Amino acid sequence: MRKIVTIDGPSGVGKGTVAQALARRHGWAYLDSGAVYRLAALFLKRQNLSLAATATQVAALQEMAVDFVMTETVVRVFLNGVAIDDVLRREETGALASQLAVKPEIRAALLDFQRNFAGDAPLIADGRDMGTVVFPEAPLKIFLDATAEIRAERRYKQLIEKGEDVTLAALKKEIAARDARDRNRLVAPLKPASDAVLIDTTDLSVQAVLEKIDALWQAHFFNF
């Protein structure tokens, strides 16, 4: 069985920060599912295609190539060989990705891409349905959560540090809307896998979350 750890949760809960730290610490491959959907949205836009789920869009996505290159401090993301970090994390890109993710045909087109990512290499995968849909066989599944207010505040700090012009009120509204879309969509709604370990990060630092996961890691993979 392939070594896989899935980390799911809502927007702004710290999935990426935690998953990247674990991937660096253990030398595993890293898959950012949220980035895949963001990249798909950007790819379609750059092909002058709408976000509709037609055969044209599904076929176009077969030509999308994604690479995550991990350095000591950041993860560089490449779309068909071109660095895309500058627009990938913008709020408008996230909103487009969330719209795309509710379309069953698009999700199906990207499912095999994610399952085959990095071949048989050990993998850390973060997203919203990694443990429930993409890697239901993963030996260790984690679901991170936090209050919407805390998640908005964390995201606000990140974006301000990057020099983006955002308001906390707007972020709270966007996160509430995204939560509703993600939790209520008919296909792969945001929810913990039945065997996932739930961790509330509202009052926890990143280091505290990593310590909890490391204890679980030892229990699951020490004799794997």
Curated annotation (Swiss-Prot):
UniProt binding sites for ATP: 9-17
Catalytic reaction equation(s): CMP + ATP = CDP + ADP; dCMP + ATP = dCDP + ADP
The name this protein goes by in its record: Cytidylate kinase
Keywords assigned by UniProt, alphabetized: ATP-binding, Cytoplasm, Kinase, Nucleotide-binding, Transferase
Organism: Dichelobacter nodosus (strain VCS1703A)
Molecular function terms, GO-annotated: ATP binding; CMP kinase activity; dCMP kinase activity
GO-annotated biological processes: pyrimidine nucleotide metabolic process
SUPFAM superfamilies assigned: P-loop containing nucleoside triphosphate hydrolases (SSF52540)
Location in the cell: Cytoplasm
Organism phylogeny: Bacteria, Pseudomonadati, Pseudomonadota, Gammaproteobacteria, Cardiobacteriales
UniProt GO cellular component terms: cytoplasm
